[in-house]
């Protein structure tokens, strides 16, 4: 993979991706260490690396790191900013498209409204950006809702051929439809010209999702209900975001040394033997550390 940390941002590709922790038993001491599952740990290690080691204007995760850390993590192809969708927009050949899609555990399709912004872009292959520079317009061939549906159909065909679950997702960014105005404010502050044209990225009901995928006919239920349920059922129950415990560093003899120092200080202040009420309070404080 390219050394993107020493490259300009327009010299390498970056994509959105979805991670779901499938299983984590890293803190279960009843299981031998070599048999434990480390999904949550792997996820957090990638997040840490993205913010510390691979930060370039934003947190990034190299695919090479993901390959090492994807054990017990389910990887989804994400939205139109995902690698699969972008490859379709770029008209890559079928063999390359299948190679790209095979990397993911499931493929995503999303409502037309999510990607309606493409219909507002130019139908020219190259456009001029704010700096007057020529730039390829990835969306120039997407001119109708039928074009959006055809892209989703291509993803479905890919999933069928590769044996991947195809899941209808909402790319949810906010809870309720009226919350779009808050995202518009955030996007406007970042300089987006179309911030007021917010896509419907709210948490939709099952009926709303079924209506959005009515074009899929009898398979709409498969994409909206059945396949998401299969993904959910494959995930271990009750994985807390933060494992229980304080995880203080272990230093040999630290507990004994701290107790001895505190007790000696108490004797200097209150005499020896230390009064019972002082000793009890000291013990309570030590137990909480």
Kindly give the residue locations of the regions a language model identified.
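Extended substrate/RNA-proximal surfaces in nucleic-acid metabolism proteins
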Residues: 1-161, 223, 260
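Phosphate/diphosphate-binding loops
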Residues: 14-22, 155-161, 165, 174, ...
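Hydrophobic alpha-helical scaffolding
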Residues: 33-36, 141-148, 196-202, 214-221, ...
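Generic recognition of stable, solvent-exposed alpha-helical segments in well-folded globular domains
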Residues: 38, 95, 99-102, 150-157, ...
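Generic, well-ordered alpha-helical scaffold segments in large soluble proteins
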Residues: 46-50, 99-103, 154, 158-162, ...
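Flexible loop/turn segments at secondary-structure boundaries
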Residues: 82-85, 114-118, 174-177, 240-241, ...
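Non-catalytic structural connector segments
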Residues: 111, 125-134, 165-168, 216-288
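Active-site glycine-centered loops adjacent to acidic/histidine catalytic or metal-binding residues
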Residues: 171
